Amino acid sequence: MVMEDEPREATIKPSYWLDACEDISCDLIDDLVSEFDPSSVAVNESTDENGVINDFFGGIDHILDSIKNGGGLPNNGVSDTNSQINEVTVTPQVIAKETVKENGLQKNGGKRDEFSKEEGDKDRKRARVCSYQSERSNLSGRGHVNNSREGDRFMNRKRTRNWDEAGNNKKKRECNNYRRDGRDREVRGYWERDKVGSNELVYRSGTWEADHERDVKKVSGGNRECDVKAEENKSKPEERKEKVVEEQARRYQLDVLEQAKAKNTIAFLETGAGKTLIAILLIKSVHKDLMSQNRKMLSVFLVPKVPLVYQQAEVIRNQTCFQVGHYCGEMGQDFWDSRRWQREFESKQVLVMTAQILLNILRHSIIRMETIDLLILDECHHAVKKHPYSLVMSEFYHTTPKDKRPAIFGMTASPVNLKGVSSQVDCAIKIRNLETKLDSTVCTIKDRKELEKHVPMPSEIVVEYDKAATMWSLHETIKQMIAAVEEAAQASSRKSKWQFMGARDAGAKDELRQVYGVSERTESDGAANLIHKLRAINYTLAELGQWCAYKVGQSFLSALQSDERVNFQVDVKFQESYLSEVVSLLQCELLEGAAAEKVAAEVGKPENGNAHDEMEEGELPDDPVVSGGEHVDEVIGAAVADGKVTPKVQSLIKLLLKYQHTADFRAIVFVERVVAALVLPKVFAELPSLSFIRCASMIGHNNSQEMKSSQMQDTISKFRDGHVTLLVATSVAEEGLDIRQCNVVMRFDLAKTVLAYIQSRGRARKPGSDYILMVERGNVSHAAFLRNARNSEETLRKEAIERTDLSHLKDTSRLISIDAVPGTVYKVEATGAMVSLNSAVGLVHFYCSQLPGDRYAILRPEFSMEKHEKPGGHTEYSCRLQLPCNAPFEILEGPVCSSMRLAQQAVCLAACKKLHEMGAFTDMLLPDKGSGQDAEKADQDDEGEPVPGTARHREFYPEGVADVLKGEWVSSGKEVCESSKLFHLYMYNVRCVDFGSSKDPFLSEVSEFAILFGNELDAEVLSMSMDLYVARAMITKASLAFKGSLDITENQLSSLKKFHVRLMSIVLDVDVEPSTTPWDPAKAYLFVPVTDNTSMEPIKGINWELVEKITKTTAWDNPLQRARPDVYLGTNERTLGGDRREYGFGKLRHNIVFGQKSHPTYGIRGAVASFDVVRASGLLPVRDAFEKEVEEDLSKGKLMMADGCMVAEDLIGKIVTAAHSGKRFYVDSICYDMSAETSFPRKEGYLGPLEYNTYADYYKQKYGVDLNCKQQPLIKGRGVSYCKNLLSPRFEQSGESETVLDKTYYVFLPPELCVVHPLSGSLIRGAQRLPSIMRRVESMLLAVQLKNLISYPIPTSKILEALTAASCQETFCYERAELLGDAYLKWVVSRFLFLKYPQKHEGQLTRMRQQMVSNMVLYQFALVKGLQSYIQADRFAPSRWSAPGVPPVFDEDTKDGGSSFFDEEQKPVSEENSDVFEDGEMEDGELEGDLSSYRVLSSKTLADVVEALIGVYYVEGGKIAANHLMKWIGIHVEDDPDEVDGTLKNVNVPESVLKSIDFVGLERALKYEFKEKGLLVEAITHASRPSSGVSCYQRLEFVGDAVLDHLITRHLFFTYTSLPPGRLTDLRAAAVNNENFARVAVKHKLHLYLRHGSSALEKQIREFVKEVQTESSKPGFNSFGLGDCKAPKVLGDIVESIAGAIFLDSGKDTTAAWKVFQPLLQPMVTPETLPMHPVRELQERCQQQAEGLEYKASRSGNTATVEVFIDGVQVGVAQNPQKKMAQKLAARNALAALKEKEIAESKEKHINNGNAGEDQGENENGNKKNGHQPFTRQTLNDICLRKNWPMPSYRCVKEGGPAHAKRFTFGVRVNTSDRGWTDECIGEPMPSVKKAKDSAAVLLLELLNKTFS
């Protein structure tokens, strides 16, 4: 307890946190914190009421202190001794409490297995503690000093290749450092801005994260219980699941199971009898048998309908431990390839799917029947006729050898799926047929007592209703409309009725939808859709009444008017006119009846109201609710009397009213038609008496108003949970739907089959349920059906038990027989894939749907029948198939067959065979998308890792070194001998072309060097001239010159190597001794000094005198000359959590550094090391000895330095090291007019009191140094900068004035604090240029080496340009060449594919091109050729440059040969890191050893380099050179000249078509005359044009697109040679885009010659032409594709197709094509006329100003609305039918609004400044308008520097939001010297990290102002 009269600081022990943290791993510290049990600490004076030490970090200090001293864990928290650590136990109650606290579970929710896991974690932590203590005891036993720190062991850990992971680890370490920083004070609260009240700074207890999480939980608290339950379910043991399932089985279920184990079985049991449980038990039995054979099980569970997929899969998952996969059509399995399916088969044990999916993958040989172990068929009675169940069995099961067939288990509530059975024999025949089909035996229950006990049957109630009065006039009117539509459709198509409805009558459309999920929504369906809608209205009129029919018609009309797609259908007006007429007719009739007032009120709504809100597909519009005063019976009664609602509907409503007070009411109403299911809930919603009902519809997939699976699942879930109490459903809900809460089932429409009767009854699962059958009074057929259904059910049950003997049956034709030989099929022997007559029609439709097309084209097969009359009146048929014009063939005649259906199947089967033979089908009999065998390369990463070829995919690659630099001679020289070797001396010449405005003499006082190589360099390297950016406005050129060859002895070589190491260790700030330097033979060259006389012979040109002087001097014995500046200066706040003074002392003493370290900078003002520490280290002479010589030496003109006396004038030009700060300075002059007693200068702009009186006072107060020689003149010096990258322009982006830029900053130093450096200033300045020069030389040598590999002569400098990325920030990069290479590669590959594959359509060609030119493929090519070793991708950093004999700074602390005293006890890496990598093996992506020779490259960079190489070779050597390079890379695109002739020969156009085209006008517009007219015809023919033997333009568009792209890119590249790559890319994008080409087509009237057959396209073209004409009327306006009207893509396509046609017609002459198109494309975009897309302009503006940009889009009917928000404030909005156009307009409006706002603010600021007078004069310095200083992080940093505090500590407390509108929230605190750590201040969420830190800094400044004021 802290005494009141004693300061708090006095009660806290000195913390050992720093010492412990620096030689104890972060993992161990975390373990100790977690092991520290507060409950075990006795409550005493030093603890609070909870038993926790008041100063938490003091308690941790106690633990760490004990560990460091070898005493183990202290006895007051964890344990007494080492041996007791493993005996520490924690009670389960405590663990359970902690688990509840962390996971949010219930208090009793902990499980025993969780205890063991947590105890295991604690054991591992204790093991690490023991290991650490053992290590410490070993070290201390050897006599090492206790307070010495161990080197950072974790620098040796293996590095992963995943760059993102490295970043994450860095963040974790920073987080750990942040936690350490809080050692002095426990965090008890935080400060933030009051968001509700006065916006003042408010204090809150706790942590920001906890408060924020609590707020979030308040919002989502309702879901907590569900989460807990889900967690509990996950924690259930697997054995428990198995046992529960076994215990649930009833005796009759086990009986059926035993039979199913013995043989194939069909379980014939009532709904709710538990058939699924039997299937689950059977799956487990099969799995157990296979496990005994070490085989994996694959069971397939088939269901007939989509809802059952989800239901059954969930049941199996809950009841078993198997991996279960579920599959239905909406999941897109039709487009899965075999590899995706194989992954599913390997990872799953049970597959639940619809039968059609299994049939598909069997037919395409993705799976084989013999690989399935168990096949379960739910509702197996469907296995009749052509149902997928039946086809699976007949086509695949029965054709598989018996010993390889899977076991079969069928489940059904009725084995007969017909209207009923006429007799016992009839029933027996139907059951036998099902058994034969499924190769199984029906099994049912003989004793039904147990079944009746567990499966209660609902009460069956029959309700009669009166027959509805027929509305003859309305019915006849609608029928006449239907007939008129059919007649109009027949007339327009000029086809027979079969042809118009042929696909539908032949069943192709239904099969197509079921088999491949293709939904035919095209223009020609308009008439059929209208007929369907009129028939639905007519049905509703008859069955539900006029009121409902009006609602249906109104909904159809509303949906048609608001559907965006109708704009592109040819007969929109046609449909709208008919529907409007019907709605008007029904409306008039309603106005005359009892509901006239209601309808009139409804009709009288304003047109701009919400009567026609946007609806989901398949929904009806909501209508207003009837006023509460009306009684339902009065409304319905009046409606029935007037014929507006049928008695059937009235009876249904009365039935529902009877259940008004029924508890937990849940009902299903079954209807026959979808339209009834949709309209009845709307009727119920309008009746107030049915307000107790919450109603929803449930419809299936096979209709025009289909319901998505997700919607269906949502509806079922709501019904199960009670959010929906009434389902109006079609037959989709009859089978298998398991809703145990359902207590009422109503058959609004009587079932059509016995099965439907039984199945729908089974939906009433709750005991005491009602099954209500509504029958028409007096309807004989209804009564007969009910009798037949009841009798048939009993007959079926009896037959299943008694088994009638059919051996004496005379008519055996009714019994089916299964033929093991498949019927007429086409089978691919290579894969086993097959197509039969049953699947051929659907496959042809699927193929057509995959052909490339647009919304205007109708891509589906057309069939025409021909009758063949045979003698005897028999008629046969043959079918003619016509495929779309972009298929490999168009017409195919089929064989003569007995029926139209069979004829259609036969011709489709023949078409499938032919398509496969022509390559349109793969060997899996799926449409070939152009993938081929290369598809394997394009596989996606299933684990979510970045895909190769993208910028996010990064890898480590070894840095390349040219072979010419390699030499073993650098490793010699250890033994002194006189033998000599031949070397080559190269002098580097640096000449200043122009000094500019610089007058600095230092820039010209530079020593020269030469470079010694073991091999001769290439001549191109010597001819290279490089720019060095030494100073602003100074132009410096550097080059190499060969000076000759010379022999050097081993002794001389040894001296040169020592000189080289001494020189580079200073230049690169690396402390290294020449004797311990490792020399890499990969870099064999040396830097040597040269004499002024360059005309001497090479051996005499070396300055041997300087070499001897530098290598023999004793000055190097002083560590101050070797130590890097960071010894004293330290680094940023993330370097260490401790005292930087101790850091500096440790660096001096032991040459080791603890903790994380980053490269130091001079950006931190002021020194941080105490001079006393330096003096105490013994590294400086005793300064007392100086006093005796001071007077004598000063009189001789000498200066007393820290290391002796020196003549003052000799110091000029030297380098001195400041002992008090460790910094180095060039000596500019000696200031004889200044001394230590000179007044210390006042800071510029500072008006306060002087901080220091004299220089002596400054050094005394700042560094604690008493100067002895205060009368000595001061040394004027300038800082020695770090070695910089001189290859990058560093002075262009500064916005400061020239005066500021040219200003040199000097310091004035007392000589007695300076040590003279052995190396002169001119020598260092010259040497600092060497790294940059060698970087360029090394890069150039690599380029020469690559050039030799490619073996084609082009300038090496161009190859270097292609290898240099923009990230290098040099004066050249590959981006311009990459742009040209990309276009050239695309053109060459497109030409090659077009000519080589004349049968491939445009979609296939596009995919094949993508596989040849994609970044992933180019990346793989680059790896094969080793380009990763030649690429320059990083900005050159000398500190990371690996000079010969000098390791880089980056790996300073992990290098060999260091002087650490821990080196005696080195452990293997695998042993040290055993806590991280338990197996001791390197993980994928990790690298061992030194990482300095590795660099990170993205795979996109490698791909870009390939394109850049193609570009430079094309520029320098034309097509021949580019093609040579592509061939070397691996891209083979050589084409045969004869292929062009073959292509032209394939263009055969009928004479009638040629005569219909105005070639003269079109060729006049193009100014080109075609030799082959057929190419021009094809180029202007759209796919919507009815086929006339002419292909569409798609293939020509494919090649023309590449031709124009290449030609325009080439034109821009060579026209604007100095344009930056980014601007060149923008120019290309503006010139090469479909919108621009479309305007070219309109400008030259090419659209007038377009051959198409779409009225919607014609309409859109007219609108676009009008818009372009309006644009053209504006003087000087050219949108270059950025106009306000989006062009039809077809117009741009024909420009590209015509370009392709000209290219082919001219014999592949691109010059001819450019000659035609250059004038057509005028005016061409230029840098001056280049428009910027508003979206991009706004994005860039927001990025520059760090503002959050967000777009919000919504759609209402046919209009899209896009809103623009900046920092949450709306700044723009626009509406357009097209979303992208609306976004562009909204961005444009936002930009205009922002500009207006800026102008207004500028004016207001001008007015305010004018009125403010002189008081506001300070604003010119950047202050805010109110005169207050704008606080930022820099303000806080300045305060910390003045107060001598550590830098503030920031942390990100939250990062969230979408990618385009991220928000960052930061916290900050600072460690004050006298009061410890401040509370954390949390800033506001900001769109950038900088602004977020600024926001937090402002709060902390306010807090500091309050605290210290």
Curated annotation (Swiss-Prot):
The protein, known as: Endoribonuclease Dicer homolog 1
GO MF, one annotated term: ribonuclease III activity
Chain intervals for the UniProt region annotation (Disordered): 99-177, 929-952, 1801-1831
InterPro entries xref list: Dicer_dimer_sf (IPR038248), Dicer_dimerisation_dom (IPR005034), dsRBD_dom (IPR014720), Helicase/UvrB_N (IPR006935), Helicase_ATP-bd (IPR014001), Helicase_C-like (IPR001650), P-loop_NTPase (IPR027417), PAZ_dom (IPR003100)
SUPFAM superfamilies in UniProt: dsRNA-binding domain-like, P-loop containing nucleoside triphosphate hydrolases, PAZ domain, RNase III domain-like
Gene (name only): DCL1
DRBM domain mapped to chain residues: 1733-1796, 1831-1906
Effect of inactivating the gene: Embryonic lethality in sus-1 mutant. Weaker mutant (caf-1) also exists. Mutant caf-1 produces extra whorls of stamens, indefinite number of carpels and show an absence of axillary inflorescence meristems and abnormally shaped leaves and floral organs.
EC top class named in words: hydrolase
Species of provenance: Arabidopsis thaliana (Mouse-ear cress)
Binding site for ATP: 269-276
Keyword match Magnesium: yes
Site feature location: Important for activity: 1689
Expression (tissue specificity): Highly expressed in flowers and seeds and detected in leaves and stems. Found in ovule integuments, inflorescence and floral meristems, stigma of flowers until just before pollination, vasculature of the funiculus, and embryo.
Effect upon mutating residue 415 to S: In sin1-1; impaired reproductive development
Record text on subunit structure and interactions: Interacts (via N-terminus) with DDL. Interacts (via DRBM domains) with DRB1, DRB2 and DRB5. May interact with AGO1 or AGO10 through their common PAZ domains.
Function, in words: Ribonuclease (RNase) III involved in RNA-mediated post-transcriptional gene silencing (PTGS). Functions in the microRNAs (miRNAs) biogenesis pathway by cleaving primary miRNAs (pri-miRNAs) and precursor miRNAs (pre-miRNAs). Functions with DRB1/HYL1 and SERRATE proteins for accurate pri-miRNAs to miRNAs processing. Indirectly involved in the production of trans-acting small interfering RNAs (ta-siRNAs) derived from the TAS1, TAS2 or TAS3 endogenous transcripts by participating in the production of their initiating miRNAs.
Keywords for this protein: ATP-binding, Endonuclease, Helicase, Hydrolase, Magnesium, Manganese, Metal-binding, Nuclease, Nucleotide-binding, Nucleus, Repeat, RNA-binding, RNA-mediated gene silencing
E.C. code: 3.1.26.-
Motif DECH box boundaries: 378-381
Subcellular location: Nucleus
